[in-house]
């Protein structure tokens, strides 16, 4: 326990003062409490509350929620690009700019906004529970939604920006596509003919992790790189690798083995019409 406390104090010594005043950023206690409450609700409290209730439809809410996240994700991508990735960054070894220049402060702001978007996206799982789509609350889903906000909190608390922000920009780009799909599918039958690309969603996720891993792996082959926190490089590389394996496993069991294909397809080998599950 003492080692954990010492590690916490050591990490907080490196906290970036520019982000101290942002909501949720004073201490890790609040974000940790939110995530623990989230896990408790989706794994225990939520299913018990819904056990003897009919599922909520939430169609109107899902349409607004998903298209709002499309807009937010687009804005985050734009801000990352304007905060360095289309101006001063080299896309190779890009250290963190700890100055108070307008561009550096813009990067701090969008890094925080990305973290906030991960908190908002916890609603994905709450929607599953309220609609009694418990089968969609997989280990991969829960792990991804609970680990990323917490790890990103520490990332922006200490090192907002630099080459470590690449994966956040790519993730937001993927979420533009993902929430567009969810929003269209929430519209109902009118949008079904345009959702032929459902199977490619996991492929897009896999491409994301390949890009993240390739970009961050450059660090290991550079003669020198003055990025200030190499530990973040190592963690991002681990993140890309672990989630590539998890999503590859999901792809294999969902589509290669056909576990998520309609029963008619599995039995007869012929196409069947099914509703796409939104969000």
UniProtKB/Swiss-Prot annotation:
As stated in the Swiss-Prot or TrEMBL entry, residues carrying the post-translational modification N-acetylmethionine are 1
One GO molecular-function entry = fatty acid elongase activity
InterPro entries associated with the record = ELO_CS (IPR030457), ELO_fam (IPR002076), ELOVL1 (IPR033681)
Which cysteines bridge via disulfide bonds?
Answer: none
Q: Where in the cell is it found?
A: Endoplasmic reticulum membrane
Membrane topology, as annotated:
Multi-pass membrane protein
Under HAMAP family, the record lists: VLCF_elongase_1
Q: What does this protein do?
A: Catalyzes the first and rate-limiting reaction of the four reactions that constitute the long-chain fatty acids elongation cycle. This endoplasmic reticulum-bound enzymatic process allows the addition of 2 carbons to the chain of long- and very long-chain fatty acids (VLCFAs) per cycle. Condensing enzyme that exhibits activity toward saturated and monounsaturated acyl-CoA substrates, with the highest activity towards C22:0 acyl-CoA.
Instruction: Give the record's subunit note.
Output: Interacts with LASS2, TECR and HSD17B12. Interacts with TECR.
What this protein is called in its record is Very long chain fatty acid elongase 1
Organism, scientific name = Mus musculus (Mouse)
């Amino acid at each position: 326990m003492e080692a954990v406390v010492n590690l916490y104090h050591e990490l907080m010594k490196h906290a970036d003062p520019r982000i101290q005043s942002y909501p949720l950023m004073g201490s890790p206690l609040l974000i940790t409490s939110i995530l623990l409450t989230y896990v408790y609700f989706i794994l225990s409290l939520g299913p018990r509350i819904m056990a003897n209730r009919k599922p909520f439809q939430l169609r109107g809410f899902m349409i607004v929620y998903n298209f709002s996240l499309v807009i937010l994700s687009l804005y985050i991508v734009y801000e990352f690009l304007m905060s360095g990735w289309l101006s001063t960054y080299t896309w190779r070894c890009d250290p963190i700019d700890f100055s108070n220049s307008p561009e550096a402060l813009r990067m701090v702001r969008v890094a925080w906004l990305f973290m906030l978007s991960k908190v908002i996206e916890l609603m994905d799982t709450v929607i599953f529970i309220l609609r009694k789509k418990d089968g969609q609350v997989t280990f991969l889903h829960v792990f991804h939604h609970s680990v990323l906000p917490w790890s990103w909190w520490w990332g922006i608390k200490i090192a907002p920006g630099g080459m470590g922000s690449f994966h956040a920009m790519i993730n937001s780009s993927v979420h533009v596509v993902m929430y567009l799909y969810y929003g269209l599918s929430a519209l109902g039958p009118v949008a079904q003919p345009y959702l032929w690309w459902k199977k490619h969603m996991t492929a897009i996720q896999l491409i994301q992790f390949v890009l993240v891993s390739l970009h961050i792996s450059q660090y290991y082959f550079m003669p020198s790189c003055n990025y200030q926190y190499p530990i973040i490089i190592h963690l991002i590389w681990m993140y890309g690798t672990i989630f590539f394996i998890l999503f590859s496993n999901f792809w294999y069991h969902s589509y290669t083995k056909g576990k998520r294909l309609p029963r008619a397809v599995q039995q007869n080998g012929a196409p069947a019409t099914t509703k796409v599950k939104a969000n």
